[in-house]
Amino acid sequence: MNLKNTLKQYGITSIWHFTDASNLASIEKYGLLSLDLLAQQKIHVSCYGGDELSHRLDRGKGLDKFVHLAIIRDHPMQYIKVKNGIIKNPIWLEIDTSVLFENESGCCNQLANASSAKCYKIEHLEEVIDLNTLLNKPHWSEPVRKSQLIVANKIDYSKILGVHHG
């Protein structure tokens, strides 16, 4: 099944990115940028979602050139970052799925920068991620909850459909 049909079949109309509200003004100005573009353009980030280890792992796998996203608005990494006090004022950015068609995009059935993780082209979404389980409120310990989507380089602010607190 092609990506458009997969999204329609599973009722996926938005995808998600969590961050701290302190980053919103920068996102409004520049869009949602990959770690690599943030560094290249020397853009100040008030609060990174990832720590130095996460950034090093991203760079090692070439994932620093991608914006990391979730299919559901309930990702375990957001919970951990809030619990550890890294993100103090969490927000979820609701993003139009059209970004998956406009830029190079991929999917992974776990955290993309995990040592055992392999990312696949977005066209393989249904084969890679158990969408039935993920979209039916899986238990917090279900590994599928760590699934990620990645979109190359930048997501324009115009593709952000909404900002949700929490």
Each model region followed by its residue ranges:
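Active-site-proximal loop/hinge segments that shape catalytic or ion-binding/gating pockets
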Residues: 1-166
